C-alpha cells in the first residue's frame, strides 16, 4: 500500500503515484454509502483532500517556526509518512503495508527529484516554471507526463528489489574482456565516428555510446571531445532504458502479467522483496527458521575446473570469435525465456546530464538520448549534444551567480558601495551585460537595466529586499530562456535530432557485429560471475558484493531466484532466502554507515554477515581510516541516485590528502557461521585484493 505525491504549498497536485491497494483504500474512504450512483471524485482530488491538512500544517510550521516535521506515523503505526521540501514543491511518500522504512521512502523521494532534474534540467530550480512543466494545462499532456514518471517509479522499485546493481546503486559490468574490446571498437567505428562524419547529422555531435544487456554494462565508448559521464547519470540512463524495454525475466513475478500494457497508476503494483523490520538477528520469521535448516547442495561446494589463472569468475574465450556451445547449455532455461526478437525503437529523448562544456563544469547540460534495441534485452544507447549546448553553460553560470548574490543579500543589508566592491558582482555584471547584448530579448534587457539601477546607483541604491526581488525576477527569466531553448525544442516536440535512416544504419551495423553473440550475452547477463570460481579459495563464502565507489562499479555473483531463471542456488526457497539476507545486509550497512560505522560483522542464524568500507590509493595500498561524518535520519540517503554520497565522502577524505588520488571501496559478504570470525576477516581482505586485481580490466 504505497503512494507518492508532489504538491504545491496550496495542496495543488503536481504529480502522484499509487499502487492498487492504496487506490482501493481511497475508494473505500471516499465511497458514498447513501448514493451509490454518485460518481466518486477523481483520484487526484481524493489525494488532495486526504493530504491537504498534512501539506498545510507542514507549510504553516515552516513559515511560523522555520522548521517542520519530516516523518511521522499514524495511530497504531498503520501508515508511515515521509515529507521533504525541494524548492517550492513538497514531496510526500506514504507506506501502509510495513514493507518500506523511513529510509526507503526518503530514498524514493530523492530519486524522483533526481529524475525530474534529468528530464527538466535547470527548470527545476524555479518553482513557478517547474509547476508549469509538471502540471501542463492540457489534460492529455498531463496524463501522458504523469504516466511516464509513474512508470519510472514502478521500474525503479522493481529494479531495486530484483537487481543487485540497483540495490547498492552501482554499475554492474558484463565481464568478458575480448567481447568488450570487440564492442568498444564497433562503438567507436560504427556509432560515434559514423554519426560524427555524416553530413546529415544536423550539428548533433555523438558523445557517448554504450551497450546494455538487461541492466548490465557490456561496453562504453566516449568521443575524444566528450567529458566523462558520472556513474550516477549512467545508472539513471540504465533505469530509463529498462523502463522503455523492461527485461522479461525481471518482471515475470509481478502481479500484473504485462506491466507495460497500461502505464497508469492503476496498473503499477509495487512489491517489496524484503521487509526492513526483520533485519536484526532476533527478527527471524518462521520462513527464516525453516530455511536455516536447509543444507546446501553438495555440488555447490565442488568447484568446476578452473578456466585459467586470469579468471575471476568469468570464462575467457581466447580464440575463434564465438563461445563454445557448452557455455550456452549451462543456462538453457534462461534462453527459453529470453528468445531474442527486435522491439520497436523509441523516439529520441531530451535529457539533462552533468558535463564539461568548453573546459568548464556545467550541471544539467542538454543531451539527446537514442535507445536503439538490438534484440530483446540487448540495447544500444547513443548520447548526442546539440550546437546550442554552450548556451546552457552561460545560463547555468549566470543563475549560479545570481543565487550566490541572493545568499549574500540574505545574510545582511549591503550598502551600494560595498555591493559594488564585491568581485562576484563585478564578474556577474560583465557576464550579464555580454549575454543581454547578444540575446537582445526586450524583457530581460529591461529587467537587467532595472536591476543595475538599483544595485549600482550611487545616489539612490536599492534596498536588500528590492535587490532580492530583482534577483529572483532575473533568475526566472534566465530559466525561461533555458526552458524555451532546451525543453520547448526537445526532439519529442519536433526539435532537431538525428535522421531516422542514420539511426537505422547504426542499429543495423551493431546488430551484424553481435549476431553471433546474442544468445551467449543473454545467458551471460544472468550468470555473469559464478560462486564456484571462488569456493576453492574461500570456503564457507555464500555471497559477496564488491563496489568500487570511485568509479561506481560493482562485482557480484549472479543472484537470480525467479521461476524461469536461476543462479547456482537454484530456484527454490534457499535462493530466495539468501537474496533476502543480502538485501537486508545492504540496508543495515547503510544505516550503520549513516551513523559513522565503516565495519559491520554479526551472526544471524546460520550465517555471518559482514560489511567493510575502506580507502586506498591508486597503487592499491590501504590508507589510514578516518571517522566518517555522522548523518541525521532525514539527511540525503546513502547511494548515487539520491545525492551521490560517496563522491562527497571522497572529497571529505581527500581534504587531508590533496596530492594523492584516493579511492573508496565497499565489500558486503555472507558466510556460513561455522567459519571462525578471524578467518572471515582474513578472507575478506584476500577477496578484496583478488577483486581489485580483476577490476583492473578496462571497460572504456
Curated annotation (Swiss-Prot):
GO terms for cellular component: BLOC-3 complex; cytoplasm; cytoplasmic vesicle; cytosol; lysosome. [DE]-X(4)-L-L repeats lie at residues 45-51, 147-153, 516-522, 644-650. Residues 275-286 have a biased composition (Low complexity). One of its GO terms (biological process) is visual perception. It comes from the Eukaryota. It holds the Pfam family Fuz_longin_1. Ubiquitous. InterPro entries: FUZ/MON1/HPS1_longin_1 (IPR043972), FUZ/MON1/HPS1_longin_2 (IPR043971), FUZ/MON1/HPS1_longin_3 (IPR043970), HPS1 (IPR026053). Residues 249-317 are annotated as: Disordered. A motif (Melanosome targeting signal) lies at residues 698-700. GO terms for molecular function: guanyl-nucleotide exchange factor activity; protein dimerization activity. Residues 264-274 have a biased composition (Polar residues). The keyword Nuclease does not apply. Keywords: Albinism, Disease variant, Guanine-nucleotide releasing factor, Hermansky-Pudlak syndrome, Repeat, Sensory transduction, Vision. Component of the biogenesis of lysosome-related organelles complex-3 (or BLOC-3), a heterodimer of HPS1 and HPS4. HPS1 cannot but BLOC-3 complex (heterodimer of HPS1 and HPS4) can interact with the GTP-bound form of RAB9A and RAB9B. HPS1 and BLOC-3 complex do not interact with the GDP-bound form of RAB9A and RAB9B. Component of the BLOC-3 complex, a complex that acts as a guanine exchange factor (GEF) for RAB32 and RAB38, promotes the exchange of GDP to GTP, converting them from an inactive GDP-bound form into an active GTP-bound form. The BLOC-3 complex plays an important role in the control of melanin production and melanosome biogenesis and promotes the membrane localization of RAB32 and RAB38. It is linked to Hermansky-Pudlak syndrome 1: A form of Hermansky-Pudlak syndrome, a genetically heterogeneous autosomal recessive disorder characterized by oculocutaneous albinism, bleeding due to platelet storage pool deficiency, and lysosomal storage defects. This syndrome results from defects of diverse cytoplasmic organelles including melanosomes, platelet dense granules and lysosomes. Ceroid storage in the lungs is associated with pulmonary fibrosis, a common cause of premature death in individuals with HPS. This is BLOC-3 complex member HPS1. It comes from Homo sapiens (Human). The lineage of its organism: Eukaryota, Metazoa, Chordata, Craniata, Vertebrata. The gene is HPS1.
Amino acid at each position: 500500500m504505497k503512494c507518492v505525491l508532489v504538491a504545491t504549498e496550496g495542496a495543488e497536485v503536481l504529480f502522484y503515484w499509487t499502487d492498487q491497494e492504496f487506490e482501493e483504500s481511497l475508494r473505500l474512504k471516499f465511497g458514498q454509502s447513501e448514493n451509490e450512483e454518485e460518481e466518486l471524485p477523481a483520484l487526484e482530488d481524493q489525494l488532495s483532500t486526504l493530504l491537504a491538512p498534512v501539506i498545510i500544517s507542514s507549510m504553516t510550521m515552516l513559515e511560523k517556526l522555520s522548521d517542520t516535521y519530516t516523518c511521522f506515523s499514524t495511530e497504531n503505526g498503520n501508515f508511515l509518512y515521509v515529507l521533504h521540501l525541494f524548492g517550492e514543491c513538497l514531496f510526500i511518500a506514504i507506506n501502509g503495508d510495513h514493507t518500506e522504512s523511513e529510509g526507503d521512502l526518503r530514498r524514493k523521494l530523492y530519486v524522483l527529484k533526481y529524475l525530474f532534474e534529468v528530464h527538466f534540467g535547470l527548470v527545476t530550480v524555479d518553482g513557478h516554471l517547474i509547476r508549469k512543466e509538471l502540471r501542463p494545462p492540457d489534460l492529455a499532456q498531463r496524463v501522458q507526463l504523469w504516466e511516464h514518471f509513474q512508470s519510472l517509479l514502478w521500474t525503479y522499485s522493481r529494479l531495486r528489489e530484483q537487481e543487485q546493481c540497483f540495490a547498492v546503486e552501482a554499475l554492474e559490468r558484463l565481464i568478458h574482456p575480448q567481447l568488450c574490446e570487440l564492442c568498444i571498437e564497433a562503438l567507436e567505428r560504427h556509432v560515434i565516428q559514423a554519426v560524427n562524419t555524416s553530413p546529415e547529422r544536423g550539428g548533433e555531435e555523438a558523445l557517448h555510446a554504450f551497450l546494455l544487456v538487461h541492466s548490465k554494462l557490456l561496453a562504453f565508448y566516449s568521443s575524444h571531445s566528450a567529458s566523462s559521464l558520472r556513474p550516477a547519470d549512467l545508472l539513471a540512463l540504465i533505469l530509463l532504458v529498462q523502463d522503455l524495454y523492461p527485461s522479461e525475466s525481471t518482471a515475470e513475478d509481478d502481479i500484473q502479467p504485462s506491466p507495460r500494457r497500461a502505464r497508469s497508476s492503476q496498473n503499477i503494483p509495487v512489491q517489496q522483496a524484503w521487509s526492513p523490520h526483520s533485519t536484526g538477528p532476533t527478527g527471524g520469521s518462521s520462513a527464516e527458521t525453516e530455511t536455516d535448516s536447509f543444507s546446501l547442495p553438495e555440488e555447490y561446494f565442488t568447484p568446476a575446473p578452473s578456466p585459467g589463472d586470469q579468471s575471476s569468475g568469468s570464462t575467457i574465450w581466447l580464440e575463434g570469435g564465438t563461445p563454445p556451445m557448452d557455455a550456452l547449455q549451462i543456462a538453457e532455461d534462461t534462453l527459453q525465456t529470453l528468445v531474442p526478437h527486435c522491439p520497436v525503437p523509441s523516439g529520441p529523448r531530451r535529457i539533462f546530464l552533468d558535463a564539461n562544456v568548453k573546459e568548464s563544469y556545467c550541471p544539467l547540460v542538454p543531451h539527446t538520448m537514442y535507445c536503439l534495441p538490438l534484440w530483446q534485452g540487448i540495447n544500444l544507447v547513443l548520447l548526442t549534444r546539440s550546437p546550442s549546448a554552450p548556451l546552457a553553460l552561460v545560463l547555468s553560470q549566470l543563475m549560479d551567480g545570481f543565487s550566490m548574490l541572493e545568499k549574500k543579500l540574505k545574510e545582511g543589508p549591503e550598502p551600494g558601495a560595498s555591493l559594488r566592491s564585491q568581485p562576484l558582482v563585478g564578474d556577474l555584471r560583465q557576464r550579464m551585460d555580454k549575454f543581454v547584448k547578444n540575446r537582445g530579448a526586450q524583457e530581460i534587457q529591461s529587467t537587467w537595466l532595472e536591476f543595475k539601477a538599483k544595485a549600482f546607483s550611487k545616489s539612490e541604491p536599492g534596498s536588500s529586499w528590492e535587490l532580492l526581488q530583482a534577483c529572483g525576477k532575473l533568475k526566472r527569466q534566465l530559466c525561461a530562456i533555458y526552458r524555451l531553448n532546451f525543453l520547448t525544442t526537445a526532439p519529442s516536440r519536433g526539435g532537431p535530432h538525428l535522421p531516422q535512416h542514420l539511426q537505422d544504419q547504426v542499429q543495423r551495423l551493431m546488430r551484424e557485429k553481435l549476431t553471433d553473440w546474442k544468445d551467449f550475452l543473454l545467458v551471460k547477463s544472468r550468470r555473469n560471475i559464478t560462486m564456484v570460481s571462488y569456493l576453492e579459495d574461500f570456503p564457507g563464502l555464500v555471497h559477496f558484493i564488491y563496489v568500487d565507489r570511485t568509479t561506481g562499479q560493482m562485482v557480484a555473483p549472479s543472484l537470480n531466484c525467479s521461476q524461469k531463471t536461476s543462479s547456482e542456488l537454484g530456484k527454490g526457497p534457499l535462493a530466495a532466502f539468501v537474496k533476502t539476507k543480502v538485501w537486508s545486509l545492504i540496508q543495515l550497512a547503510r544505516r550503520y554507515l549513516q551513523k559513522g560505522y565503516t565495519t559491520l560483522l554479526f551472526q544471524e542464524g546460520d550465517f555471518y554477515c559482514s560489511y567493510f568500507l575502506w580507502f586506498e590509493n591508486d597503487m592499491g595500498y590501504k590508507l589510514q581510516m578516518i571517522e566518517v561524518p555522522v548523518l541525521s535520519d532525514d539527511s540525503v540517503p546513502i547511494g548515487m541516485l539520491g545525492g551521490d554520497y560517496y563522491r562527497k565522502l571522497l572529497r571529505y577524505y581527500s581534504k587531508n590528502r590533496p596530492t594523492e588520488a584516493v579511492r573508496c571501496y565497499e565489500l558486503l559478504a555472507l558466510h556460513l557461521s561455522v567459519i571462525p570470525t578471524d578467518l572471515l576477516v582474513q578472507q575478506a581482505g584476500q577477496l578484496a585484493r583478488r577483486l581489485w586485481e580483476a577490476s583492473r580490466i578496462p571497460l572504456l
